[in-house]
């Protein structure tokens, strides 16, 4: 993702380059990064920035730091792209998207079309037909000729390529060609990589001029009026006590004169949370994926089940917004361990502290919980998925 430009054509009273200016409540680059982070097929993101922008960049992408590798670019787009490709090389990707950081409105359906079209021989280029009449003018602004726009298209990004081929193309161009290429498909054409075009998206604008911010703000406002696909799942689990020396809650070992009875480690909190996460995909419950009768799960850590649910969500392009767990028990006391439990969930879920709630209550001495025969857990999870709620 290229974000090393200075954005001088965009003009502004603000001192920051266009990719760091606010679009709504977030910088432009934040919107762009989010589009790729939400797609399950994107495994690594290299963000190429201007050497002077590291501090402002890190502030802008706080929400996505764990998803990005920052690389400093060069004096030209071509040099910056090559540095990004070199940084990506160690990950041995099969394909690579090359995208302008100032295009913040990439839709999931465009990425899907690119992924189903690209192959090991050809690159993929989203394009839009040119509709305006084109004129060639001279230095004094006199019209020289009218250019027929039949078969003329404007190129967009992301452009997708077989990684090794586009890397070789950029390296060859840097070594032997003095021509300055304006996009990566031009380098691919020069190198002999066939480019397959697909229909682009008229909303996938590149913010180049100051007026483009007005267009972007209007489109963002329209998008915010859509109904986002936000799903909530609930989970419930209960385990009885048996003789033991400790029990596991939220992955944390708690010294106690009893343990929770179960086929796995009987982590009642993780079981409830796993079911809540699975519910956002209509994916059944833990027992659907991990049969209680299967000996391989005997005494297994419940984090395995939780991470399985996380992978299902990731494959669907989901992002967890928050989780809430309520433990219902007369004993042991949960308070002394709540902070450690929360930290463990922060690491597993990659969520900040304010997006995780763990609390405990008693059952006021009523029922089996009141008789100190076991522990119950309730969990709620909110997950955001790409797209809108179907009409």
Curated annotation (Swiss-Prot):
Swiss-Prot/TrEMBL site (Positions MEP for the nucleophilic attack) positions: 149, 206
Transition state stabilizer, annotated site positions: 9, 18, 263, 362
Q: What's in the keyword line of the UniProt record?
A: Isoprene biosynthesis, Lyase, Metal-binding, Multifunctional enzyme, Nucleotidyltransferase, Transferase
Write out the residues that bind a divalent metal cation: 237, 239, 271
Which GO molecular function terms does the record list?
2-C-methyl-D-erythritol 2,4-cyclodiphosphate synthase activity; 2-C-methyl-D-erythritol 4-phosphate cytidylyltransferase activity; metal ion binding
Region annotation (2-C-methyl-D-erythritol 2,4-cyclodiphosphate synthase) ranges: 231-391
Q: In which pathway does it act?
A: Isoprenoid biosynthesis; isopentenyl diphosphate biosynthesis via DXP pathway; isopentenyl diphosphate from 1-deoxy-D-xylulose 5-phosphate: step 2/6; Isoprenoid biosynthesis; isopentenyl diphosphate biosynthesis via DXP pathway; isopentenyl diphosphate from 1-deoxy-D-xylulose 5-phosphate: step 4/6
Q: Give the EC number(s) listed in the UniProt record.
A: 2.7.7.60, 4.6.1.12
Chain sites annotated for binding 4-CDP-2-C-methyl-D-erythritol 2-phosphate: 237-239, 263-264, 285-287, 361-364, 368, 371
Region annotation 2-C-methyl-D-erythritol 4-phosphate cytidylyltransferase: where it falls in the sequence: 1-230
Q: Name one GO biological process term.
A: terpenoid biosynthetic process
The record's catalysed reaction(s) read:
2-C-methyl-D-erythritol 4-phosphate + CTP + H(+) = 4-CDP-2-C-methyl-D-erythritol + diphosphate; 4-CDP-2-C-methyl-D-erythritol 2-phosphate = 2-C-methyl-D-erythritol 2,4-cyclic diphosphate + CMP
| Cofactor annotation | a divalent metal cation
- An example Pfam family from this entry, by short name, is IspD
Q: Which family does it belong to?
A: In the N-terminal section; belongs to the IspD/TarI cytidylyltransferase family. IspD subfamily.
Q: What does this protein do?
A: Bifunctional enzyme that catalyzes the formation of 4-diphosphocytidyl-2-C-methyl-D-erythritol from CTP and 2-C-methyl-D-erythritol 4-phosphate (MEP) (IspD), and catalyzes the conversion of 4-diphosphocytidyl-2-C-methyl-D-erythritol 2-phosphate (CDP-ME2P) to 2-C-methyl-D-erythritol 2,4-cyclodiphosphate (ME-CPP) with a corresponding release of cytidine 5-monophosphate (CMP) (IspF).
The name this protein goes by in its record: Bifunctional enzyme IspD/IspF
Q: Which gene encodes it?
A: ispDF
């Amino acid at each position: 993702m290229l974000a090393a430009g200075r954005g001088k054509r965009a003009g502004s009273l603000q001192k920051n380059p266009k990719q760091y200016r606010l679009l709504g409540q977030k910088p432009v680059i934040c919107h762009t990064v989010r589009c790729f982070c939400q797609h399950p097929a994107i495994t690594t993101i290299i963000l190429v920035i201007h050497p002077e922008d590291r501090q402002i960049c890190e502030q802008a992408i706080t929400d996505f730091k764990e998803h990005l590798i920052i690389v400093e670019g060069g004096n030209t787009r071509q040099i910056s792209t090559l540095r990004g490709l070199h940084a990506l090389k160690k990950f041995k990707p099969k394909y690579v998207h090359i995208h302008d950081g100032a295009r913040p409105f990439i839709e999931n359906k465009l990425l899907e079309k690119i992924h189903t079209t690209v192959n090991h021989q050809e690159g993929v280029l989203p394009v839009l037909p040119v509709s305006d009449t084109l004129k060639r003018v001279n230095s004094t602004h006199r019209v020289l000729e009218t250019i027929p726009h039949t078969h003329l298209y404007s190129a967009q990004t992301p452009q997708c390529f077989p990684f090794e081929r586009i890397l070789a193309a950029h390296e060859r161009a840097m070594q032997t060609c003095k021509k300055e290429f304006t996009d990566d498909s031009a380098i691919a054409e020069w190198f002999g990589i066939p480019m397959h075009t697909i229909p682009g998206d008229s909303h996938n604008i590149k913010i180049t001029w100051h007026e483009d911010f007005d267009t972007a703000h209007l489109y963002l406002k329209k998008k915010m009026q859509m109904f986002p696909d936000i799903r909530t799942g609930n989970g419930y689990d209960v385990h009885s006590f048996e003789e033991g020396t400790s029990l596991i809650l939220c992955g944390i070992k708690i010294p106690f004169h009893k343990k929770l009875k179960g086929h796995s480690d009987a982590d009642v909190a993780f079981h409830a949370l796993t079911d809540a996460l699975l519910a956002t995909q209509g994916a059944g419950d833990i027992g659907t994926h991990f049969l209680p009768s299967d000996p391989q799960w005997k005494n297994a850590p419940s984090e395995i089940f939780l991470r399985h649910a996380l992978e299902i969500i990731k494959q669907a392009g989901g992002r967890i917004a928050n989780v809430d767990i309520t433990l219902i028990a007369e004993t042991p006391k949960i308070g002394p361990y709540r902070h450690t439990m929360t930290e463990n969930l922060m690491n597993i879920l990659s969520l900040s502290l304010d997006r995780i709630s763990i609390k405990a209550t008693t059952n006021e001495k009523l029922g089996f919980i009141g008789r100190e025969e076991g522990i119950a857990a309730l969990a709620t999870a909110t997950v955001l998925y790409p797209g809108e709620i179907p009409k």
